[in-house]
UniProtKB/Swiss-Prot annotation:
Its main location: membrane. GO terms for cellular component: plasma membrane. Belongs to the ABC-4 integral membrane protein family. Residues 105-119 have a biased composition (Low complexity). InterPro entries: ABC3_permease_C. The keyword Cell inner membrane does not apply. It is a multi-pass membrane protein. This is Uncharacterized ABC transporter permease MG468. Keywords: Cell membrane, Membrane, Transmembrane, Transmembrane helix, Transport.
Length: 1783
């Protein structure tokens, strides 16, 4: 046996190459299979493990609930009812004084300085130092609540004056609207009561409001100390002179108050220790003091709650006396009301609403007792929503018609202005007005001060109920035409009110249902079922280069929190809430179960009847049920303590815990409110203030604070009814609680590594626990944190707590434009709820997805039903989705309801795909391996056949032969297995990288796969041994002597046959060579297969990148831009877009239509215009020199909105306020303190701007200011402290005290920037490079800098290739370019320019790109057809009854550009403008203004005209090419456009619009009517204007304007008709923020991601598989030579030269390689066609039709090297061989 092993080892040398070949092939098999199987297993096992360890859900139900749509049925009856007895006649100046003036005492020792004896006639009850009752605690408490922190003993205190809110007057003074002469104010007579006399609310034109609008303030008491009643204020009759009122000269002095008493308030930072209220949170304050004048401008708007609900609420209400007056001063009248009864139609409710309403009724008491929603009276509210009776005073009805008889008919259906003479019989009346105002208090402490009016009858009769009811019932009958009677008018008004109130009822019902939706579902459909509500948002980041977009996952409040933390701080531990613990995630804010620590710890009290005194008393609520007369209310002791500490610095007994505060409250309430008086009057007032703080916080539901839109809690320190007990510095009007958790995030592993970020360390100054332990230092900690530990999203900063992953975000689709996510550049982050909401607020156009998630294993515990069907059945009738989509498994690839879950099936798909690929490769390589093993064993046996036969004859068994062969088997198995697994381990990262780039799940780290090693070893070993057994079994099936004889024979049969055979056509050697190929056909097949695969892979790896590169090169030659931005086509009404370089935004450019916002002449102390002069707004350079334009004019910053009181006024009065205005957030976003009230101009503007716009501005504004302050020049200029960092928001803002002029309450026009700051600001914007970094909101001006931008005009509409077959939803647009464009080159395949083909303005030619030609198989000479729809007249055409016949336009294809990205069609821009009707002489241009006609005279007429500007060289456009990688139009300039040409503070035709255009109908109609001559002519014909053919354009349009003035003669008619034409989205962004997805840059980015991936695959192929194949070819060739060595040596022996033998060898290899080359080229051609189709469909990239032979040259060279190696080996062996070796 030993000898046998020795013989085998000797033979190894002879079979080395064949043995090496086997080892290499097996190595390849093991390497590839191990890699692929390991990757597949990693993917699937990782996914499975993740599902298991994260408690992940696998069933999804869309959170798309059916919308509530309740229906109410209304009926009209006549009924008795209660009505207010309080009457106000004049409705101009109406004061209510709850107290007598002498209630607050008089300073007997102080003289008024006049010596008038009338001073002594003031009624008073004694000196303030003697009579305690003059300082009743309640009244002093009210004063203190209004800011009188230090009440001087010797001081006259004026009472709290309350006036009804006059929206057309200014602060109660005698100033009315000079244009309308209308006084719309609150009237107590409009209070409305229910059938039992309970006060319901205030009736206002169809609505019942729960509040009445008042104004209040101690500074507004008319009169002054020492004045007698005879010298009280007299307000003169207003005289109109230039619309300005004239007052008595004494008014100003009489209205001024004594401001000598100042209060200085000092705020100390609250320490963060264990017992303090600020545990774990920061309360910002600082040692700043605020100078506050308590009597200055104290005019506070009040929305007074009419019915507080209980005596307790009255007692803590500063307007208790007024409320009581409203409640008690009522009377019952018979037949005085029209009663509208509203019944909810239960039969019309959907299943969700019906069942939820029943659930609410059943659980109303439970909800009222335990809810934090504030619905303490839910049961009664539900009853009212099901049936409500609205009692309308018939006097209101008459007064409505009477006061608006001149305009009301135009607002009523079926009536018009022409019916006035028929319906109303007018009598001339006389008005008598008494202007003497009396302020003497009445006996019941209520005085009504009013102008007395008397008015004669004007012919308006009282409504007759029977007649009105008859007319009312006819209104909704079909084909009803109302009679022209007064009763029909009354009925129409009632129906209007019915409609308004019905809508209000519907809204209230919908709001209530939606408020409890989740609670209802949890209690019903999801009862006893565990579920989570997933919240995921795709957010774009505009303020940081760290990442283009983030996938943000809210991991708060989830039952199935599928966050798996790989490393870092355990975010999940403090987010996940077990089922048994439903506390808020921010428990330390609310207190959790520890009442001593919760900042917003709520304690429930109830106010109930006292058994002893018969009054009402407050106590802790200790019963579940409330008595019928008791009221539950919450108190927030710690919040009250903070207020008390801030308000009462002299107080010494401030509790520090909730329990102490509870005791204090108990003491305060011990004797009831009626016994609050104490000897210490100051303490009594303080107690009253404390009560206000406890019981009237500004919020009812503390949970609202969690839904903050910033990474902190901001709590307004105000209480109800206008009382503001906390006097803080200007920038600290809110209590700010910094919540560190909202600044923490877990990120994806791939993104962390890509951006060189790190997780926070566990210890040290940068550890997370350090931040939590010192919350008062958190902002500084965050600022000091190195960049590697944090990242930002649009100004929000997050510390990196760890890296993690989750199932539901494992492989998401982040964009429809780019289906493959890019985990290297796109970040996946996990945050808590507060951070999630903050991101949604700071991110523009965030795409949010919400759905319910369930776990099938949990559901199976509740039912035997299929879990998906179980959930579907539970939700049937609740969700607004098809029955089949109510629920589905996340791996169901047919349900692409959510982008983020659309790829959850990916692991299974990858596994299947890799299994198929690995199987195919494995089969091929296994066949090859088996072939080589068989060849090795066969060759080895044949080589030693004689020796084996002799050994066999000596008694050697077959088993021993097999054991001997184990040497071969062992060497092959161990070497191939070890190397295969080792290389798989070493290269696993590369294999994973191809997939891992597009998956947010982190794959496990590489590890040596011992299982694969041992498995492959044993499989290889036993396969080798099995084949050996078969071979020996077959060998020894013959007798031994036969075997010995066969082994000694010389096999010359083939050679001898060829040598003896005579042939006339082929020499013997040639025949031998042919026979050599044919006799080894199996090897030929193997070589051809291997070579074909190698060449194919080389061709793919080399050709496709070349095609990608060619596509990029050809596209770059055609496109000299990065972005193509389609804008909203300007309308006729809006006019052409003005253009300016972005760095010049805000600069006046009159020649280009940008008119200044400011006037050079500013009226002194004006309150109605901007206080800025253009001459004072000239831009300066750093040397303080004016900056000039090219024509030498000095540039003025006259179009940047600057803060001013006049600007705030114009915002609500100027319908052209925003025309060509620029707005920068930092300039106006700071609090301005005006007489005790805070004004933030940005907040005013923000209300009129779409949310996504304001979010983007908010996100990027701070970045600009950082750039300003990091510039040394401007940082030095900021030494005055213009710019400061707000410590509580951590953002830079202006300091009002340093940038504004001194503010005088009587000169609000003083709200303006001072000269020092103006100089600073003008230098900032004079630095154009710096100015480009600012984000500006702009109206009507598009940023176009000729150096980096160029305009174009695109045409869209129905498109097709046949004139009669157009696709209405075609995605194609025609891009009209300047034929001399420097941004679009249009190069054909030969490198020639095609632009001259579209240079003509007359020829309708189009050039298409290669992508369009490929997608549509179109050729030069073909035609395309389009019907333009984005015309400038698209809205003007809607004025016509019969639309214009817009014809289809044909374009001839005259060229194909090599542009390969996307599908493009290019035409001449002038032709495009003509198609869109942007060109033309009349009604076209940049609209500078709408002005009154002058008619050639100095004075203007009453007619208006549009002032157009047509700059030289200007070409209309609706699109912009940009070379910038981050175009200002996309990242900085947010441009809004008004499609109606009116530029006011509105976005629709609602209240803002109506208020602005009231009495400006002529001007507005002039603006919004069509200007196109063709439409004007057709519209004139429809309006039956005669002699249209003889009129010129101006005359014809004038006639139309006059016609529409008649038809649209009211604001309501204008709004209704205009909204039907223009829709409601009338001021909108010119560029949709989402539209960037269609830009060239995005397509290019997607393509580059795809290219990079292909290159990675190519590198893998070239680096691993291809070398395997070539080495295998070399090994096979050498092994074949070993077999044929004897033949060639024999040929050499008989005289054939070595060269001839070498040629004989090449005749085998060369045909094999040529055949392989031909096969690979054919297969590659088919593969390229398929790849081209796939790439174009996925990435819209046309791979150019190029075939690269260079890769094949590389392949041929490699094969040449292979043949050379084989030939060299053959040559060496042949040269050194002796003849005996051949035998």
């Amino acid at each position: 046996m030993f000898s046998f092993f020795k013989q085998i080892f000797k033979s190894l040398k002879k079979f080395f190459f064949l043995l090496f070949g086997i080892i290499f092939v097996l190595f390849s098999i093991i390497f590839l299979e191990t890699s692929i199987v390991q990757l597949s297993n990693n993917l699937v096992s990782t996914y499975t493990t993740l599902v298991s360890k994260t408690n992940s859900s696998d069933i999804v139900a869309p959170a798309i609930l059916k919308e509530a749509n309740p229906v109410y049925i209304a009926s009209l009856t006549n009924d008795s009812g209660y009505f207010s007895k309080i009457k106000i006649d004049d409705k101009k100046i109406n004061y209510l004084f709850p107290y007598q003036e002498n209630d607050f005492g008089s300073d007997s020792g102080q003289s008024n300085g006049s010596g008038d004896n009338q001073n002594k006639t003031i009624p008073r009850k004694g000196d303030v130092n003697e009579k305690d009752k003059l300082f009743l605690a309640r009244k002093r408490g009210i004063l203190k609540a209004y800011g009188e922190a230090n009440i001087a003993e010797k001081r006259i205190y004026k009472g709290l004056a309350v006036s009804f809110n006059n929206t057309d007057s200014f602060n109660g003074s005698d100033i009315s609207d000079s244009i309308t002469n209308r006084h719309i104010i609150s009237d107590p007579q409009n209070l409305i009561y229910d059938a039992s006399g309970n006060l319901l609310g205030y009736f206002a034109d169809g609505l019942i409001k729960e509040t009445i609008s008042l104004r209040a303030g101690i500074a507004r008491f008319p009169g002054d100390k020492g004045k007698s009643t005879g010298t009280q204020v007299k307000i003169t009759q207003k005289q109109q002179t230039n619309n300005d009122p004239q007052k008595d000269s004494t008014v100003n002095s009489l209205y001024k108050t004594n401001n000598k008493d100042k209060v200085w308030f000092k705020s100390d930072e609250t320490k963060a220790d264990n017992t303090d209220i600020s545990a774990n949170y920061l309360f910002t304050g600082g040692n700043e003091a605020a100078n506050w004048f308590p009597n200055l401008y104290a005019n506070i708007p009040i929305d007074l709650e009419i019915d507080p609900g209980s005596q307790f609420w009255k007692d803590v209400n500063p307007f208790k006396e007024i409320v009581e007056e409203f409640q008690t001063q009522k009377e019952s009248k018979d037949n005085q009301s029209f009663t509208l009864t509203f019944n909810l139609d239960i039969s019309k409710l959907n299943k969700l609403d019906n069942e939820q309403l029943k659930w609410l009724e059943t659980n109303a008491k439970t909800i009222a007792n335990n809810s934090s929603f504030g619905d303490w009276d839910l049961e009664n509210k539900l009853k009212q929503l099901k049936k409500f009776e609205l009692k309308i005073n018939k006097d209101w009805l008459k007064k409505k018609v009477e006061s608006e008889k001149d305009t009301i008919l135009n607002s009523l259906p079926g009536f018009s202005d022409s019916d006035k003479d028929t319906i109303f019989k007018t009598q001339n009346g006389m008005m008598v007005r008494n202007n003497n105002l009396s302020f003497q208090p009445s006996s019941n402490n209520l005085q009504l001060v009013q102008n007395q009016n008397s008015q004669a009858s004007n012919g308006i009769a009282d409504p007759n109920f029977s007649n009105v009811q008859t007319a009312y019932n006819k209104i909704h009958q079909s084909n009803n035409t109302p009679e022209k009677t007064l009763d029909a008018v009354y009925a129409a008004v009632l129906d209007q009110w019915r409609s308004i109130f019905q809508e209000d009822l519907v809204k209230k019902t919908v709001d209530l249902l939606e408020k409890y939706r989740d609670h209802f579902l949890k209690a019903t459909a999801f009862n006893n079922i565990d579920y989570s509500k997933q919240n995921i948002a795709i957010a774009n980041n505009v303020s940081s280069a760290e990442s283009a977009s983030f996938l943000v996952s809210n991991k708060d409040e989830q039952r199935y929190n599928d966050l798996s933390l790989i490393d870092g701080v355990d975010l999940k531990s403090w987010l996940f809430k077990p089922e048994q613990n439903e506390s808020n995630p921010l428990d330390t804010i609310y207190g959790g179960q520890d009442a001593n620590n919760g900042f917003l710890q709520k304690i429930d009290y109830e106010f109930k009847p006292s058994t002893s005194s018969g009054g009402m008393t407050a106590s802790l609520k200790n019963t579940q049920a409330l008595s019928p007369k008791s009221t539950k209310f919450p108190i927030y002791p710690k919040l009250a303590n903070i207020i008390a500490q801030a308000q009462l610095p002299e107080a010494t007994n401030i509790p520090t815990t909730a329990l102490d505060a509870l005791k204090q409250w108990t003491n305060l309430d011990a004797n009831g409110f009626n016994n609050l008086k104490e000897e210490d009057k100051r303490k009594a007032a303080n107690n009253y203030l404390a009560l206000l703080s406890y019981f009237t916080p500004a919020f009812q539901d503390p949970n609202e604070l969690i839904e903050t839109n910033r990474q902190m809690l901001e709590i307004p320190i105000t209480v109800k009814n206008g009382v503001n007990p906390l006097i803080l510095p200007t920038d600290q009007q809110n209590l700010v609680v910094q919540t560190p958790e909202a600044h923490g995030a877990v990120v994806s592993q791939q993104w962390l590594f890509r951006h060189n970020k790190e997780i926070l360390p566990q210890e040290g100054e940068y550890a997370w626990k350090t931040a939590l332990q010192t919350p008062n230092n958190f902002p500084n900690w965050l600022n000091d944190l190195p960049d590697r530990y944090k990242f930002s999203i649009n100004g929000l900063t997050f510390a990196i707590l760890g890296i993690g992953e989750s199932v539901e975000t494992g492989y998401p689709v982040l964009s429809l434009q780019s289906p493959l996510p890019n985990t290297q550049d796109e970040a996946l982050i996990f945050v808590n709820d507060q951070a999630y909401r903050s991101i949604l607020f700071a991110v523009p156009a965030a795409n949010q997805e919400n759905y319910y998630a369930f776990k099938s294993t949990d559901l199976k515990q509740h039912t035997d039903q299929d879990p998906v069907q179980f959930i579907a059945n539970r939700l049937e009738g609740y969700l607004d989705v098809p029955r089949s989509d109510l629920a589905f498994n996340v791996k169901d690839i047919s349900k692409f309801n959510y982008l983020t879950t659309a790829r959850n099936y990916f692991p299974d798909l990858v596994q299947s795909y890799l299994a198929i690929v690995s199987t195919v490769i494995a089969i091929f390589l296994i066949i090859l391996a088996l072939y080589l093993i068989i060849l090795l064993i066969k060759s080895f046996i044949k080589k030693n056949q004689t020796e084996f036969s002799i050994i066999r004859a000596g008694g050697f068994s077959t088993t021993k032969f097999i054991v001997g062969m184990s040497v071969f088997a062992g060497i092959v198995a161990i070497v191939s297995s070890f190397l295969g697994v080792l290389f798989a381990f070493l290269l696993e990262g590369q294999v994973k990288g191809i997939i891992n780039r597009y998956w947010f799940i982190a794959l496990p780290e590489n590890s040596f796969n011992w299982l694969s090693f041992f498995g492959s070893f044993f499989i290889t070993f036993f396969v080798f041994e099995f084949i050996s057994w078969i071979a020996f079994k077959q060998l020894f099936s013959k007798p031994v002597n036969v075997l010995i004889d066969q082994g000694n024979e010389t096999k010359f049969s083939v050679l001898l046959h060829l040598l003896k055979h005579k042939s006339h056509t082929m020499s013997p050697l040639t025949k031998f060579r042919v026979s050599l190929i044919v006799s080894r056909f199996s090897r030929l097949f193997t070589y051809v297969g291997l070579s074909s695969v190698a060449l194919l892979l080389i061709g793919i790896a080399g050709t496709i990148p070349q095609k990608f590169s060619a596509a990029q090169t050809s596209t770059s030659l055609n496109r000299n831009f990065n972005y193509k931005l389609n804008l909203q086509t300007p309308t006729e009404q809006s006019g052409w877009y003005a253009i300016q370089p972005y760095s010049h935004f805000g600069v006046t450019d009159n020649n280009n239509g940008i008119k200044t916002l400011y006037n050079e002449s500013v009226q002194a102390n004006s309150q109605n215009e901007h206080p800025y002069k253009p001459s004072n707004l000239k831009l300066k350079n750093r040397q303080d020199q004016p900056i000039k334009a090219a024509d030498g004019t000095e540039l003025e910053l006259g179009n940047l909105l600057l803060p001013s009181y006049g600007g705030a006024q114009q915002l609500n009065t100027d319908e052209n306020f925003f025309r060509h205005a620029s707005l920068s957030k930092w300039i106006i976003d700071f609090p301005i303190r005006v007489g005790g009230s805070n004004i933030n101009p940005w907040e005013i503007v923000e209300k009129s701007i779409p949310k996504q716009i304001t979010q983007l501005l908010s996100a990027s504004s701070d970045q600009f200011l950082i750039s300003v302050l990091t510039d040394d020049f401007f940082n030095n200029l900021n030494a005055n402290g213009f710019l400061i960092r707000n410590p509580r928001t951590n953002q830079i803002q202006l300091d009002a005290s340093r940038v504004l002029t001194t503010i005088d309450v009587f000169n609000p026009g003083g709200v303006k920037f001072n000269d020092s700051f103006l100089s600073f600001m003008l230098k900032v914007y004079g630095d154009f490079e710096l100015a480009k970094q600012d984000s500006k909101l702009n109206f009507g001006i598009v940023p176009v800098d000729p150096a980096i931008e160029e305009t174009y005009t695109y045409v869209e509409g129905p498109f097709g290739f046949q004139e009669d077959n157009l696709d209405e939803n075609s995605p194609y647009t025609l891009t009209g370019i300047n034929p001399e464009s420097s941004f679009v080159n249009l190069i054909d395949g030969s490198g020639n320019s095609l632009r001259n083909l579209i240079s003509s303005d007359q020829e309708m030619n189009v050039i298409v790109n290669a992508g369009f030609q490929y997608a549509n198989n179109i050729n030069i000479g073909d035609y395309v057809y389009i019907k333009p729809k984005n015309t400038a007249t698209r809205y003007s055409e809607k004025f016509l009854k019969a639309p214009l016949n817009n014809s289809t336009v044909a374009f001839k294809v005259v060229g194909v550009s090599t542009d390969a990205f996307g599908q493009e069609l290019y035409i001449n821009q002038h032709i495009a403008n003509n198609l869109l009707k942007l060109s033309g002489n009349q009604g076209r241009g940049i609209i500078r203004d709408v002005i009154k006609k002058t008619n050639g005279q100095s004075q203007s007429s009453d007619e208006y005209e549009i002032d157009y500007v047509k700059p030289n060289g200007y070409v209309p456009f609706n699109g912009v090419f940009s070379k910038e990688l981050k175009p200002s139009l996309l990242n900085k300039a947010l441009v809004l456009n008004s499609i109606i040409g009116v530029w006011g503070n509105f976005t629709d035709f609602g209240n803002n619009f109506q208020n602005l255009v009231r009495n400006k109908l002529d001007k507005v109609i002039t603006s919004i009517l069509p200007t196109d001559p063709e439409i004007i002519n057709k519209l004139a014909q429809e309006k039956q204007i005669i002699n249209t053919t003889s009129m010129n354009y101006e005359s014809l349009r004038k006639e139309l304007v006059n016609k529409y003035k008649t038809e649209w003669n009211s604001v309501n008619l204008l709004s209704q008709n205009a909204s039907s034409i223009f829709g409601n989205n009338i001021i909108a962004p010119v560029l949709n923020i989402d539209a960037a997805g269609t830009s060239a840059q995005i397509i290019r980015n997607n393509a580059e991601v795809l290219f990079n991936t292909v290159n990675q695959v190519d590198a893998f192929l070239l680096g691993t598989i291809i070398p395997f194949i070539f080495i295998t070819c070399v090994v096979l060739g050498i092994s074949m030579l070993e077999e044929m060595k004897r033949i060639f040596i024999s040929l050499k022996a008989i005289g054939y030269r070595d060269v001839q033998n070498l040629i004989s060898l090449l005749t085998f290899f060369i045909p094999a390689f040529v055949l392989a080359l031909l096969i690979s080229i054919g297969v590659l051609a088919g593969v390229l066609i398929g790849i081209q189709a796939v790439v174009f469909n996925v990435a819209q990239v046309f791979l150019t039709n190029v075939f690269e032979f260079l890769p094949y040259m590389v392949g041929i060279v490699l094969f040449g090297v292979t043949i050379f190696v084989i030939g060299s080996y053959f040559w060496i062996k042949l040269r050194s061989a002796e003849l005996k070796e051949g035998f």
